[in-house]
């Protein structure tokens, strides 16, 4: 079986002298691994293709009784122009990539995840000074794709719109309530969200990476937003950032 697939390269690893395995993200197949036999030597079949973060059109064959994916050839569609030479921006991209790989999406979200990853890389490649909150906004959006980020437009208890008065995020319940309804909610871990932090949560869901790069909230609002997202990710997805990577919490 042979097919053509556009994919984003997440990782490339050598497993023999001239052979590599390649981790790919496809809008139709999600994340999968393929072998590029001779890929580290061939200039004709994979010219300029096999680098992480490249966007490539591959011809793929499935072979063997286990249905291994083998890359027959590739055509480079686009690649970051500046990202790899800017450590701060590259660090943000790697942070986003590590979270994405730690929390695989369901088949119904493959196309959304692919589009989000492409937009993330494109934005970080072009933005001179992206917001320090950019990776956290990406994390919140991914949590939303998993169905684990609470709606933030109205109180989950009384239904009233949430606004400048802020809100309270009830972590275990995965919902946001207005301050007046906090007493009516069950116990557990609560994270306060002021009006600006609540707006950041809305931005993570309703806007995209290009808008996130320009976010410059008050530091206190950034801390509130950061704490709420970290608590939600830890409780509902079982992930925490430790020593340069995401681990099971």
UniProtKB/Swiss-Prot annotation:
Gene3D superfamilies on file: Nucleic acid-binding proteins (2.40.50.140), Recombination protein O, C-terminal domain (1.20.1440.120)
Keyword Nuclease recorded: no
GO biological process terms, semicolon-separated: DNA recombination; double-strand break repair
Keyword DNA damage attributed: yes
Keywords from the named record: DNA damage, DNA recombination, DNA repair
GO CC annotations, alphabetized: bacterial nucleoid
InterPro entries registered for this protein in UniProt: ARFGAP/RecO, DNA_rep/recomb_RecO_N, NA-bd_OB-fold, RecO, RecO_C
Function: Involved in DNA repair and RecF pathway recombination.
Family: Belongs to the RecO family.
HAMAP family named in the record: RecO
Name of the protein described by the UniProt record: DNA repair protein RecO
């Amino acid at each position: 079986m042979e097919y053509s697939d556009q994919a984003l390269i997440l990782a490339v690893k050598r497993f023999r002298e001239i052979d590599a395995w390649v981790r790919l993200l496809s809008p139709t197949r999600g994340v999968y691994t393929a072998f590029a036999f001779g890929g580290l030597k061939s200039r004709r079949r994979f010219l300029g293709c096999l680098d992480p973060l490249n966007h490539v059109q591959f011809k793929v064959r499935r072979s063997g009784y286990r249905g291994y994916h083998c890359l027959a050839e590739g055509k480079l569609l686009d690649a970051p122009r500046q990202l790899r030479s800017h450590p701060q921006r590259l660090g943000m991209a790697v942070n986003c990539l590590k979270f994405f790989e730690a929390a695989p999406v369901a088949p119904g979200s493959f196309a959304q995840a692919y589009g989000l990853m492409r937009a993330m890389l494109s934005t970080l490649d072009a933005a001179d000074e992206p917001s320090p909150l950019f990776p956290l906004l990406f994390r919140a959006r991914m949590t939303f794709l998993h169905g684990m980020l609470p709606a933030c437009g109205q109180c989950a208890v009384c239904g009233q719109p949430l606004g400048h008065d802020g809100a309270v995020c009830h972590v275990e319940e995965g919902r946001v309530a207005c301050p007046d309804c906090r007493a009516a909610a069950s116990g557990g871990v609560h994270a306060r969200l002021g009006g600006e932090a609540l707006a950041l949560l809305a931005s993570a869901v309703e806007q995209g990476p290009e808008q996130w790069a320009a976010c410059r909230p008050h530091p206190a609002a950034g801390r509130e937003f950061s704490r709420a997202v970290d608590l939600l990710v830890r409780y509902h997805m079982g992930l925490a950032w430790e020593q340069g990577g995401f681990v099971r919490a």
